[in-house]
Every structure is written in structure tokens, then in C-alpha cells.
């Protein structure tokens, strides 16, 4: 049988020279490297070009924003450095201090976002201070001074009560001798431990003088009394602002420091923090100040409370 006839029909064209591939299409052999005789044709894609251009545009915008932010930071640093190197001084040569200092902030350039948010200044309650030009012109008067002293020895209270003038002793009611003198007009509480409390003086000098007189009386009765550790424990002052006061409005506004129970006590109790003074304020305008250790604390407390009372003046 013929060789061509033994091949299947679909393979006869490949074996015969007439059925060979047309010229122009290369036939690959096992020894021919892949891609030989093929002309590469570039593939152009418009989508890939547009993506590259968009990425380049975004990179340029980011670089511009970074340059603007660096310029803002540099300007802020230069301003802070100049202000720290040249502090302002007052007439006394000292740098003035503000009560509420504000942090320096720089406004961002148009089209950019700020580097740091502006800080919020916290609200803190402060005690209103009276300017020197608005002084009240009222000086509280001292009404009572309480002082203590140590006589430095044990005392027989029954002997003192029997032998001293103007002295009374009732141990069932109070475990101390109550003694009084006329000049200065004061009262003393004398305890068996040797401690003594003197009340009723109108000034610091009167309180010390009265305490020395009581100690001299105890010495004359045969006790080795001394005069040790004299100290003023409390001072009480009072004054009148000459106008009625709305206590209801005052207690609502300053409820953190004050209490007002007209059914229990007719006055408003105001507890000042600095100086540590307790004030009794009455609707008539009378003010009582207590709890001071020195006279200056009473004057300072009244100058602090006067502008507050002026703001709650009754208008009739």
C-alpha cells in the first residue's frame, strides 16, 4: 500500500509538500530558539498611561502640601524664639505675669490643614479682687480677740475660786475657773492644767495685757505661774456696708462657698478660702468676720467680699 494512503486524512496534507504551510509563517524546529523570526509589536494601552499621569500628579500635590506645612512650622518656631529672647519688662524691671496665659497658635495657610488643633483654655473659678481705684473705704472694727497662754504649773481651782476676786467655779457645769477684770474688760478661763484662755479684748495689746494680769493674780495666790506660749487664736471684726443685700441671689450664685437658712439663722454664712475667713452677712448690710489670726486677714477678706455684696445690692 502506498505510504500516503496509510496516513490518516488529516495528516496527509502535512506530509505532502503541496500541503505545507504557506510561505511567511516560519516552521519551528527543536533546535530553533523560541521567538526567532517573530517581530515584536508594541501594545499601547491608554488606560495605563492615564493611571501613571494621575499618580505623578498626586505625588506633586503631596510634595507641595509638605513644603507648605514645613514653612508654617518654621514660621511658628521663629516667632516663639523671638518672643522668648526679648521678654517685655514693666517699670519695676520685672517681667509681668498674666492671670490667664494663652498658647501661641499660627493660622494655617489657605488650602491646608493645621498641624495641631488650637488648645482650649480651661475655665477656673477665681475670687474677684477689688482694684485699687474701687476700694471700699470701710475699715472693719475689731470686736473680740481670743488668746491662749500657758502658766506652766498645776493649779488648785478651788483655792483660786475661794481666794480670788471676781472668780467663780462650778465643776458640774464647767471644769474651769471663770475670772473677770475691768481693765481691760476681759474674761479668763483658767484650767487645772495651767492653760488659760483670755477673751473679750478689742486689740492685740489689750489681750496680752489682760493675760499678764490674770497670771499675776495666780502668782499672788502662791502658785509658781509663768507666762509661756502666748498666742492669738481668733479675731472677730464687724462693719456695715450701708445698703441692703439680696441674700437669696448671693447664695444661688456662690452656693459653693455660702449657705443660707433663714428659718435657722437670719444671716448668710460665707466661707472664704483665701484668706480662710468665715463671714456672716445680714440683709441689713451688717457683716461679721471671724477666724482670722492677724488683723490684716480681716481687712483682706472684707475687700474681697465688698464688690460681691455691691453686685447684690437691693434697689428699692
UniProtKB/Swiss-Prot annotation:
Keywords: DNA-binding, Nucleus, Repeat, Transcription, Transcription regulation. It is found in: Nucleus. GO terms for molecular function: aryl hydrocarbon receptor binding; DNA binding; enzyme binding; RNA polymerase I core promoter sequence-specific DNA binding; RNA polymerase II cis-regulatory region sequence-specific DNA binding; RNA polymerase II core promoter sequence-specific DNA binding; RNA polymerase II general transcription initiation factor activity; RNA polymerase II-specific DNA-binding transcription factor binding. Residues 104-115, 123-133 have a biased composition (Low complexity). Its main location: nucleus. GO terms for cellular component: cytoplasm; cytosol; euchromatin; female germ cell nucleus; female pronucleus; male germ cell nucleus; male pronucleus; nucleoplasm. The keyword tRNA processing does not apply. One of its GO terms (biological process) is transcription by RNA polymerase III. It holds the Pfam family TBP. Ubiquitously expressed. Sequence repeats lie at residues 142-218, 232-309. DNA binds at residues 144, 180, 195, 234, 271. The keyword Repeat applies. Residues 1-21, 104-135 are annotated as: Disordered. Binds DNA as monomer. Belongs to the TFIID complex together with the TBP-associated factors (TAFs). Part of a TFIID-containing RNA polymerase II pre-initiation complex that is composed of TBP and at least GTF2A1, GTF2A2, GTF2E1, GTF2E2, GTF2F1, GTF2H2, GTF2H3, GTF2H4, GTF2H5, GTF2B, TCEA1, ERCC2, ERCC3, TAF1, TAF2, TAF3, TAF4, TAF5, TAF6, TAF7, TAF8, TAF9, TAF10, TAF11, TAF12 and TAF13. Component of the transcription factor SL1/TIF-IB complex, composed of TBP and at least TAF1A, TAF1B, TAF1C and TAF1D. Association of TBP to form either TFIID or SL1/TIF-IB appears to be mutually exclusive. Belongs to the TBP family. General transcription factor that functions at the core of the DNA-binding multiprotein factor TFIID. Binding of TFIID to the TATA box is the initial transcriptional step of the pre-initiation complex (PIC), playing a role in the activation of eukaryotic genes transcribed by RNA polymerase II. Component of a BRF2-containing transcription factor complex that regulates transcription mediated by RNA polymerase III. Component of the transcription factor SL1/TIF-IB complex, which is involved in the assembly of the PIC (pre-initiation complex) during RNA polymerase I-dependent transcription. This is TATA-box-binding protein. The gene is Tbp.
Amino acid at each position: 500500500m502506498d505510504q500516503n494512503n496509510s496516513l490518516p486524512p488529516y495528516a496527509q496534507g502535512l506530509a505532502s509538500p503541496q500541503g505545507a504551510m504557506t510561505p511567511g509563517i516560519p516552521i519551528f524546529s527543536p533546535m530553533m530558539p523560541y521567538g526567532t523570526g517573530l517581530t515584536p509589536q508594541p501594545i499601547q494601552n491608554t488606560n495605563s498611561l492615564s493611571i501613571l499621569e494621575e499618580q505623578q500628579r498626586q505625588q506633586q500635590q503631596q510634595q507641595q502640601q509638605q513644603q507648605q506645612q514645613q514653612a508654617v512650622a518654621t514660621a511658628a518656631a521663629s516667632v516663639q524664639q523671638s518672643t522668648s529672647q526679648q521678654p517685655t519688662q514693666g517699670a519695676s524691671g520685672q517681667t509681668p505675669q498674666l492671670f490667664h496665659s494663652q498658647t501661641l497658635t499660627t493660622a494655617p495657610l489657605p488650602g491646608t490643614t493645621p498641624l495641631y488643633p488650637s488648645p482650649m483654655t480651661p475655665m477656673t473659678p477665681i475670687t474677684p479682687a477689688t482694684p485699687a481705684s474701687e476700694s471700699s473705704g470701710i475699715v472693719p472694727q475689731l470686736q473680740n480677740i481670743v488668746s491662749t497662754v500657758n502658766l506652766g504649773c498645776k493649779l488648785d481651782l478651788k483655792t483660786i475660786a475661794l481666794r480670788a476676786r471676781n472668780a467663780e467655779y462650778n465643776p458640774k457645769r464647767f471644769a474651769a475657773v471663770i475670772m473677770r477684770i475691768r481693765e481691760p474688760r476681759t474674761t479668763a478661763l483658767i484650767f487645772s492644767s495651767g492653760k488659760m484662755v483670755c477673751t473679750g479684748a478689742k486689740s492685740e495689746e489689750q489681750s496680752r495685757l489682760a493675760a499678764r494680769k490674770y497670771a499675776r493674780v495666780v502668782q499672788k495666790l502662791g502658785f509658781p505661774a509663768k507666762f509661756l506660749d502666748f498666742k492669738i487664736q481668733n479675731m472677730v471684726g464687724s462693719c456695715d456696708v450701708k445698703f441692703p443685700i439680696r441674700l437669696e441671689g448671693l447664695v444661688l450664685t456662690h452656693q459653693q462657698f455660702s449657705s443660707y437658712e433663714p428659718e435657722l439663722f437670719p444671716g448668710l454664712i460665707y466661707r472664704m478660702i483665701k484668706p480662710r475667713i468665715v463671714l456672716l452677712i445680714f440683709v441689713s448690710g451688717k457683716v461679721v468676720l471671724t477666724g482670722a489670726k492677724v488683723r490684716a486677714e480681716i481687712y483682706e477678706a472684707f475687700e474681697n467680699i465688698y464688690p460681691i455684696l455691691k453686685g447684690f445690692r437691693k434697689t428699692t
